[in-house]
UniProtKB/Swiss-Prot annotation:
It comes from Brugia malayi. Mn(2+) 1 binds at D119, C122, H227. This is RNA-splicing ligase RtcB homolog. Its cofactor is Mn(2+). Pfam families: RtcB (PF01139).
Length: 505
């Protein structure tokens, strides 16, 4: 007999103003507790989703995010807690915005493609300029068009980077070292990139021919969905020192944000691995609450193959963002009739939102190697962490939070408390509140475009019909999400940006 909504809620208790705990027993076989971060506005959405699920009694595609946090807590060798961030919403296997870490030294520890997501290393890059809003306003339409012309966008968009099959293998294994060699990146771009733009364990041989076939023509393309390129201006500075380390020194300063991932290649790597892992689960007798949580032991051949293929897809995404940076620099140079160098178009940082990595964390005061799954969440290392660039040693790692189309974005920095509480992880964006299908039914695309224009935002869209899926009404309020993380102490607000021009797939 399924439990009622009130019975479900008896397993969930508030710890602080912004943190809830999910007690063991909420779903079967939980090895650790669950925990999620929400403020009052976001809490309503979380519990509403659970209430609807109790009413429907499991009819429909996705489980509510709270239950997904519980199911992840039942995975073998999970450490501390299964954690949900304020932008959490239901996804495949893991909710998007769910983090989990597994002890690599435990022979039962697993890696799960559902804990990374289909768009491997979907992420965000922020580039600064020395321009001010007043420099851009007179040529804003021209600039939006120039970016749209330079960056291939849309569902079936083909790349403009000439590349053969042999070079493609190199690009999968070398990541940004490849774009540096080919002249698409500046040497210092790599310094300001998570993993320095290259995961060393990548092995192109672990990426199927079908995945390569899908990825090859898409190099340097934006794709559709929630991916975008935005020209933004600095709207507020909360932490002047951190902002100055990032090269942000005034309100109205112009930046470019690029949000994209590994396109069809990453999707295929995930799909291929799920098939293989189902077999490995039968062989190793791994039992999970939800078959979407297909996984393999980290130290098994299947687990290692997935991590190597995932790393190659992650490298592809960094190459992708680097090629788009190259295109954006060209677009700006053309409109302002000067060089990208003279426009000071340096990368502030580049972060990944969907990835699994082996990292060292303190568990009960002892350093442990953990496989941290971050799906729809961002690494946020604290000040003095050895893996962040020299420029940010005193501020903590920059964390880039993209808003939704036409809403503000944020730059945060990592904190020591986040290191201790959430495996140095914080939110990644607004998080969906309406499914894509609901958005298409309820929102008119022309209305969305008109609203953007009324806000003074120039927009270029390859597939206007997809715009309503990404309308601000489809998402949670990004300010609520960021403020919840700030209040919880797992990241700290530095800068707020607002868009003045958007290009979308």
């Amino acid at each position: 007999m399924p439990r009622t909504y009130d019975e479900e809620c008896s397993y969930i208790e508030r710890i602080t103003d912004v943190v809830y705990r999910i007690k063991k027993g909420f779903v079967p076989n939980m090895n650790v507790e669950g925990r999620f971060y929400v403020n009052t506005a976001l809490e309503k959405l979380m519990f509403e989703e659970l209430r609807n699920a109790c009413r429907l009694d499991g009819i429909g595609g996705f489980l509510p995010a709270v239950r997904q946090i519980g199911n992840v807590a039942a995975l073998p060798a999970i450490v501390n807690a299964s954690i949900g961030l304020p932008d959490i919403h239901s996804g495949y296997g893991f909710a998007i915005g769910n983090i989990a870490a597994f002890d690599v030294s435990d022979p039962d520890a697993v890696v799960s493609p559902g804990g990374v997501g289909f768009d491997i290393n979907c992420g965000v890059r922020l580039i600064r300029t020395n321009l001010s809003e007043k420099d851009v306003q007179p040529v804003k339409e021209q600039l939006a068009q120039s970016l749209f012309d330079h960056i291939p966008v849309g569902v079936g968009s083909k790349g403009i980077i000439p590349i053969g099959a042999q070079q493609f293998e190199e690009c999968l294994e070398m990541g940004m070292d490849w774009t540096l060699r080919e002249g698409y990146s500046w040497a210092e771009d790599k310094e300001h990139c998570e993993e320095y733009g290259r995961m060393l364990q990548a092995d192109a041989a672990k990426v199927s021919p079908r995945a390569k076939k899908r990825g090859l023509p898409q190099l340097g393309t934006l794709g559709a969905g929630n991916h975008y390129g935005e020209v933004q201006v600095i709207d507020e500075i909360y932490d002047e020192y951190a902002a100055s380390r990032m090269g942000i020194d005034r309100l109205g300063q112009v930046c470019i944000m690029i949000h994209c991932g590994s396109r069809g290649l990453g999707h295929q790597v995930a799909t291929d691995s799920l098939v293989v892992m189902e077999k490995a689960m039968k062989r190793d007798n791994i039992i999970v609450n939800d078959r979407q949580l297909a996984c393999a032991r980290i130290n098994s051949m299947e687990g290692q193959d997935y991590l190597k293929g995932m790393a190659a897809a992650a490298n592809f995404a960094w190459v992708n963002r680097s090629c788009m940076t190259f295109c954006a620099r060209q677009a700006f140079a053309k409109v302002f009739n000067t060089s990208p160098d003279d426009l000071d178009m340096h990368v502030i940082y580049d972060v990944s939102h969907n990835i699994a990595k082996i990292e060292e964390h303190l568990i009960n005061g002892r350093p442990k190697q953990l496989c941290v799954h971050r799906k729809g969440s961002t690494r946020a290392f604290p000040p003095h962490h050895p893996l962040i660039p020299v420029d940010y040693q005193l501020t903590g790692q920059p964390v880039l939070i993209g808003g939704t189309m036409g809403t503000c974005s944020y730059v945060l920095t990592g904190t020591e408390q986040g290191m201790n509480e959430t495996f140095a992880t914080t939110c990644h964006g607004a998080g969906r509140a309406l499914s894509r299908a609901k958005s298409r039914r309820n929102i008119d695309f022309q209305e969305v475009l008109n609203k953007m224009q009324a806000m003074g935002i120039s927009i270029r869209v390859a597939s206007p019909k997809l715009v309503m899926e990404e309308a601000p009404e489809s998402y949670k309020n990004v300010t609520d999400v960021v403020n919840t993380c700030h209040e919880a102490g797992i990241s700290k607000k530095s800068v707020k940006l607002r868009p003045i021009a958007v290009i979308k797939g």
